[in-house]
């Protein structure tokens, strides 16, 4: 069993049983407890009053945070050959059609996001079982099936990404890195919370948010008072 360091224990004791009502203080504590030697991801965990087994209580949407999330996304584009140049000049890292489908079929998935033009979707249908579980299957709802490659690629290169609630109704999503400034993390956190709030499923009855906490990859949970966003 891996030994837990004294600093690690101290960090968890520091935030245990505390609910932070000041967003600046919460972010400061979050950064102070990110004590590993590598740059950690910063995560939000929002427990929502939804039951995703019902269609009108599902949450799946996209957001562009003001300061990005500190990750360079590799984007693959599946389109006709006449669109290759536009796709490449607009930020597509991997561009192709039938040969790209063949690579994916062989398990060569060297990208974080797949964008496709509508005419390519019938060819992609057979790969749904491979791409779906990885969250890589293009869909109109996520904006990854598009006829406007230039604007779509520009948005995703700027940091647009998709998030969704899991089957228990909890949203787990990164909103930055531990080396971001406090101000950048505050701005991103507020924007992400606002996005979740604005995309409240129509079937939600009563209170929407049950609880919200933030943490770094190896750090303790920092619980937030929901009034912090009022």
Swiss-Prot record:
What name appears for this protein in its UniProt entry?
Large ribosomal subunit protein uL1c
Where does the protein end up? Answer: Plastid, Chloroplast
Give the multimer and partner information. Answer: Part of the 50S ribosomal subunit.
GO CC, alphabetical: chloroplast; large ribosomal subunit
Instruction: Write down the superkingdom of origin.
Output: Eukaryota
Function statement: Binds directly to 23S rRNA. Might be involved in E site tRNA release (Potential).
Family matches, as NCBIfam families:
rplA_bact
InterPro entries for this protein:
Ribosom_uL1_bac-type, Ribosomal_uL1, Ribosomal_uL1-like, Ribosomal_uL1/biogenesis, Ribosomal_uL1_3-a/b-sand, Ribosomal_uL1_CS
Q: What are the leading ranks of the lineage?
A: Eukaryota, Sar, Stramenopiles, Ochrophyta, Bacillariophyta
Write one Gene Ontology MF term: structural constituent of ribosome
Keywords (alphabetical) are: Chloroplast, Plastid, Ribonucleoprotein, Ribosomal protein, RNA-binding, rRNA-binding
Where is it mostly found?
Answer: plastid
- Biological processes annotated in GO: translation
**Which family is this protein grouped under?**
Belongs to the universal ribosomal protein uL1 family.
A single Pfam family, by name?
Ribosomal_L1
Matching entries from PROSITE patterns are given as: RIBOSOMAL_L1
